[in-house]
Amino acid sequence: LIAAWAVEAEKVFIYMRDEYPAVLKILRTEISALEKKKIVSPGYIDLRRGAGAYICGEESAMIESIEGKRGIPRHRPPFVAQVGIFNRPTLVHNVETLHWIARICREGPEILNSVEKNGRKGLRSYSVSGRVNNPGVHLLPAGSTITDIIEAAGGMRKGHKFKAYQPGGPSSGILPASMDDIPVSYTHLRAHETNS
């Protein structure tokens, strides 16, 4: 909300994939609480459920989906800052970015610049799925390797062996377990024709 107020946004859209019903429920509850406390006007925050297409992570495809169309990226120009949602100027933020801005404001820049690993500074949220003991989002130094990430996720489940991993989304490729010492970051993975 601070980001929305800072740019004098007329409306806030929160786009959440439908695969996360528990998160959608929490968001509905929190939005309702904000409205009841008159912190925001009813309808100021519009929670939109997405169909879950990976491409909707791209800002213009997400806007298309919010508008009820197929989530396909738009041609540029114009950019969404000029012609975005419902043809209005639009500022798109990732929730993780907003999380870090708030945390840096509360705790100072040291929260990020005091952590360094494998030549990378800061912290990063890693989303872990598969046959690990504790799948979910894990906060680790930005230069973490897949070995570090699996360890943070409680290790492999009993009876399962680590064979390969996908360091990013569907377009990132799959790396063998033998490449477990590479930091999971764009700069390090680029040399292996994949990305995070």
Give a label for each model feature.
Residues 1-5:
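Histidine-anchored nucleotide/phosphate-binding helix
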Residues 18, 160-163, 175-176:
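Terminal amphipathic helices with adjacent charged low-complexity linkers/tails
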Residues 139, 166-177, 181-184:
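Accessory "access/gating" subregions that flank catalytic or transport cores
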Residues 149, 187:
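Conserved adenylation A10 loop of the ANL superfamily
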Residues 188-195:
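Single conserved hydrophobic/aromatic residue that forms the stacking wall/gate
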